[in-house]
Every structure is written in C-alpha cells, then in structure tokens.
Swiss-Prot record:
The lineage of its organism: Bacteria, Pseudomonadati, Campylobacterota, Epsilonproteobacteria, Campylobacterales. It comes from the Bacteria. This is UPF0763 protein HPG27_626. Belongs to the UPF0763 family.
C-alpha cells in the first residue's frame, strides 16, 4: 500500500484539531486534590494526542489544552498574517506615491523592509506610508514628480517675436 505524503498527514492532523476546537467534543473537569496535585477527569470524548480539550475547574474557570506544536503553529500563522498585511499596506501606499514602475519600487521597498527584520525573525510594525515617502525621498528616480512635470514657465510674448513663416517648415 502506498504511503500518503507527509503534508497530507499533517493536514489531517490539523483538520482533527480544528474539528475538536469547533465541536468542543473533549471535555474534562479539573479537581484539586491537594496543594500540589490536581485530578483531570475526562467527562466527554476521549484522549487523543492531536486534539484540543476544554477544561473547567471547581471555580468555573475554563481552559483549553492543546498540543504544544499547535501554539507554535498559531504563532507562525499570526506572524505570516501580519507580514502579508504589512506587504499589502506597503503595496497600497506605493501606488499612492505614483511609482514609475510599481514592481521596481515594490522590490526596493521589500529589500529595505527585510533590512528591518528583528533578531527574533519578525518584521517591525511600521507606518508604511511614511516608509514609502522616505523611499521616494531617497530614490526620486523611481517616482513621477508631478510638481516638476506640470511646471511651465509663464507665458512670455517676447519668445514669439522672432518667429517668422520660414520657421514653420521646421516644425
């Protein structure tokens, strides 16, 4: 019989965990026996290593017990979601600053953003609009400059005094 790929097995484990979180099928009661002993009594469901358990204590406080790898996975997913949001905001703010070539500005900004990555591997929470404006100051060649583009010298009739019909052919 052919083995399933590892990702498929992981997906099944995470699906079981998610299902156990949604259904809350595994319930237990936490009872204090002594100052340093507690009894965990399963009231509903069964003990399975890749599922969540909903625990109530004698003071009606509720807890959720999940495998430790789930906490790591949740933290990693939260980090990825934060970075995706940061990149989306960065792209939105790049567009507002009129890039000549969006992809070029995006690439420069992502490289500069990576330089800000902290020792723990996380990106800092930054104001993306200010970040893009700073890039625009440092790399003005990447953006349209509408101020200079639409500036024209004031109309001066003297510029047209030496204009004669022979010059029309040159136009």
């Amino acid at each position: 019989m052919e083995k399933l790929p590892k990702k498929r097995v992981s997906k099944t484990k995470s699906q079981k965990l998610i299902h156990s979180l949604i259904t809350q099928k595994n319930r237990a009661f936490l009872k204090k026996i002594s100052a340093n002993e507690m009894l965990l009594e399963l009231e509903k469901g069964a003990f399975k290593k890749n599922e969540a358990y909903f625990i109530s204590d004698e003071e009606d406080k509720n807890y959720v017990l999940v495998p430790d790898n789930v906490i790591s996975l949740l933290a990693e997913n939260a980090r990825k979601a934060f970075e995706a949001r940061l990149r989306a905001e960065l792209e939105r703010d790049i567009i507002t600053q009129a890039p000549i070539d969006f992809e070029d500005v995006r690439e420069v900004s992502l490289q500069l953003l990576e330089n800000l990555r902290q020792k723990d591997g996380n990106l800092p929470n930054i104001n993306t609009l200010n970040f893009v404006k700073q890039i625009k100051k440092e790399h003005p060649n990447l953006f349209f400059n509408f101020d200079n583009m639409f500036k024209q010298p004031p109309f001066n009739e003297n510029n047209f005094e030496n204009f004669d019909n022979s010059d029309e052919e040159n136009f």
